[in-house]
Each structure stands twice: as C-alpha cells, then as structure tokens.
Swiss-Prot record:
Known role: With S4 and S5 plays an important role in translational accuracy. Located at the interface of the 30S and 50S subunits.
Subunit: Part of the 30S ribosomal subunit.
GO molecular function: rRNA binding; structural constituent of ribosome
Keyword Ribosomal protein set for record: yes
Pfam families tied to this protein: Ribosom_S12_S23
Protein name: Small ribosomal subunit protein uS12cy
GO biological process: translation
Length: 124
C-alpha cells in the first residue's frame, strides 16, 4: 500500500486494455480489398486440414490475414469483402473473419443449418 507522499510523487497508472483486433480500429466491421487469396494453410499441431484464408487491405490501412468460413468460396484477388473480428484458434496470426453473404463474398451454397453465420437466405 503506497503512502500519501508516494501517491503525490507519481499517481496510479490506469490499466490499459489491449484490443484483440487492432486493425478494425474500434469498429465492429471494416471493408477491405483482397490482395491475395491463399488456397490453403495448414493448422497447428493436433489438427489437420486445408484452411482457406485471404490477405486483405482494409480501409483503415492495415494489411491483415482473414479466414474465409464455410465450404467453397468465390473470392479472387480484387474482391471487396467485409471483415469482422474473431480469431481462428488453430491458425496462428489469423485474427479476423470474412463476413459471408455481404459485398463480393457470396453465401455458402446449400446451407441448411446455422445459415445466418454464412449469409444464406431461408429456403422456400
């Protein structure tokens, strides 16, 4: 416990909270342009798959790596996408997700369950 004299000499420092998605600059989503769409990246040790990711240049000026969720996608080099926060646990350095069903990223084809997460309208 500090004395009054110590508190006068130097005040208490506020706790700085570090954001997990700095490229979004406090916004819920950001628009960006794909600079490169990687066909596949392999995950960390216990898992095995071919995950789809893309390099995206955001309107905030950051160049990030974003995960493309769902089965199949139509993204190419100059596609305009919407990016949200949210990391992929088994891909190091991937801290953002591309929002499906908005801008140039179409929804997942033939999706029946969990449709809102993949930009799919209710089937007739």
């Amino acid at each position: 416990m500090p004395t009054i004299k110590q508190l006068i000499r130097n005040t208490r420092q506020p706790i700085r909270n570090v954001t997990k998605s700095p490229a979004l600059r406090g916004c819920p989503q950001r628009r960006g342009t794909c600079t490169r769409v990687y066909s596949t990246i392999t995950p960390k040790k216990p898992n095995s798959a071919l995950r789809k990711v893309a390099r995206v240049r955001l309107t905030s000026g950051f160049e990030i790596t974003a995960y493309i969720p769902g089965i199949g996608h139509n993204l190419q080099e100059h596609s305009v996408v919407l990016v949200r926060g949210g990391r992929v646990k088994d891909l190091p350095g991937v801290r953002y997700h591309i929002v499906r069903g908005t801008l140039d990223a179409v929804g997942v084809k033939d999706r029946q369950q969990g449709r809102s997460k993949y930009g799919v309208k209710k089937p007739k």
